[in-house]
Amino acid sequence: MAEPTVCSFLTKVLCAHGGRMFLKDLRGHVELSEARLRDVLQRAGPERFLLQEVETQEGLGDAEAEAAAGAVGGGGTSAWRVVAVSSVRLCARYQRGECQACDQLHFCRRHMLGKCPNRDCWSTCTLSHDIHTPVNMQVLKSHGLFGLNENQLRILLLQNDPCLLPEVCLLYNKGEALYGYCNLKDKCNKFHVCKSFVKGECKLQTCKRSHQLIHAASLKLLQDQGLNIPSVVNFQIISTYKHMKLHKMLENTDNSSPSTEHSQGLEKQGVHAAGAAEAGPLASVPAQSAKKPCPVSCEK
């Protein structure tokens, strides 16, 4: 298979298995040596596949071990983890009936979350429930995504598109920590998280807004939104890596692109932060050329 086809197939396999897998497990689905597979993943880069070395816990099955994988440094056995990443997004303006064609997916956001009241009779919904329309197929093709079914695309979007997260509280994002200007505090029905972090744009290494997506206060909100916790964990892993990468780039005084050696360093540095982000919250809760681009974030 040509490399773009291989990458698309790898994304399909990853999303059929929850959006992330150990490298050794992914290897079982392709006729490539481990060295060749790693080369494909590294060439595609973290914009497509996030490849990180993590510490595993012995005595667990593959699925349990993958879910429990954390930062390297605890003295346990390490393995390489692969997370599916994509810049494909749902179009925000389409949700409001304001866009006919652009470089983002024209698909019902509520249906993607399994919450559209017309999901059993999609012809009564004014928004498309079909990922195979000409517009959507062109968008997927431009992102190098071929052959994904709706469930696989859903997994990919859930762990990459901030549009599908609960609505972020804007009052929380203003004023001082702990709650900003939000008087509802823990009773607020909006997401108390750094708005810039979920968009991959937070420039602060030490931010007074929360970068933790999963904690006791947010668990019910996430579940009510129709999100599964593994997908949110994947979003956390990807966002933590992006935050560290952005901060490192801002520190680079000559504004040059990070070197290969620097990027490899982020593979390990990023997983330390992501591992810590996973461990804390989870432990505290019950276990085209002429088309005009649209804004990235969804307005609800």
Swiss-Prot record:
Record's protein name: Zinc finger CCCH-type antiviral protein 1-like
PANTHER family xrefs: ZINC FINGER CCCH-TYPE ANTIVIRAL PROTEIN 1-LIKE
Disordered: region residues: 252-300
Segments forming a coiled coil: none
Any Gene Ontology CC annotation: cytosol
Entry-annotated residues carrying N-acetylalanine: A2
Organism encoding this protein: Homo sapiens (Human)
UniProt-listed Pfam families: HTH_53, zf-CCCH_PARP12
Cited Gene3D superfamilies: Winged helix-like DNA-binding domain superfamily/Winged helix DNA-binding domain
Biased composition (Polar residues): 252-263
Composition skew (Low complexity), residue ranges: 271-283
Keywords for the protein's UniProt record, in alphabetical order: Acetylation
InterPro entries noted in UniProt: WH-like_DNA-bd_sf, ZAP_HTH, Zc3hav1-like
Keyword Endoplasmic reticulum listed: no
Domain of life: Eukaryota
Keyword GTP-binding annotated: no
